[in-house]
């Protein structure tokens, strides 16, 4: 019996087979492949390739949120190394184009720009001095970013995030609806985790928010905390489990201190903020209408001074949509604490003279 020496001798015609696997491209504008029917490609830029920036980029990549990710950093060798490390995993990841550069031109045409770059605090340096250095850095990077991507959404992650969100808004020239900060989105996740541990439930079944400053003065909104629709404070009362203001403040304090604990153990935080920002990116890019506590320009929220950027629960969305902001219901004590927290942010903003 004669052995076949080619696919054609087996009756398999390569030309015919290719037509089965690959659809011909037509220049006819009425075909589904025309420009009118093509899905618009999504581009996300991450400014700063440090631990936080790369955790964000990696999480956005694995969640398949963008068709192109641009990485920008001032250190070219580290930047290229980070990009190559991700590119080498291409066989295991969604198909996403990765580009990098030290120049802001690589971000051109971005839909979402995420800023993680920031100066690190020097020993003995005051918070105000650190803030002034970060403002100087933002003066260098924000205007070029705005110039490269006129219609982008700007998401600030650098700390102090509430004040720097205000700075980015002022320097970009963008409307306030297109500049937000990561705010207390991560604080709220930590809050939900700690409550879930206390109550022995899944954190995804806990509804709880931290608002105000992303920092020491953040406010836990206990009045709206619920598990499976049951208000937590009411549930504790009905089960005769003891709690008092001191216990509640202890949990809030644990939320605030949790970042310091992670830093003391591993030197920095990265993964939690990576997932937090990726969740914001998904909500913004896909218009999911999910509620997030993010830093936004507060205009009359519970008596907070106009021009203050502070975290409030709202559904961040593309500006073409109707405004998503809605005022949370707070007790008078919670509103008082929120105003006190916002005052700290407002005072720092006034010192900058922007």
Curated annotation (Swiss-Prot):
Do you know what upregulates this one?
By hypoxia.
Q: In which pathway does it act?
A: Fermentation; pyruvate fermentation to lactate; (S)-lactate from pyruvate: step 1/1
Show the CDD domains listed in the entry: LDH_1
Region spans: Disordered: 302-332
Q: Per UniProt, where does substrate bind?
A: 127, 159, 190, 269
Q: Where do the annotations place NAD(+) binding?
A: 73-78, 120, 159
Reactions catalysed = (S)-lactate + NAD(+) = pyruvate + NADH + H(+)
Q: Which GO terms describe its molecular function?
A: L-lactate dehydrogenase activity
Name the Pfam families for this protein: Ldh_1_C, Ldh_1_N
Q: Known Gene3D superfamilies for this protein?
A: Lactate dehydrogenase/glycoside hydrolase, family 4, C-terminal, NAD(P)-binding Rossmann-like Domain
Q: How does it assemble?
A: Homotetramer.
Similarity annotation: Belongs to the LDH/MDH superfamily. LDH family.
Protein name as it appears in the record: L-lactate dehydrogenase
The record lists the organism as Zea mays
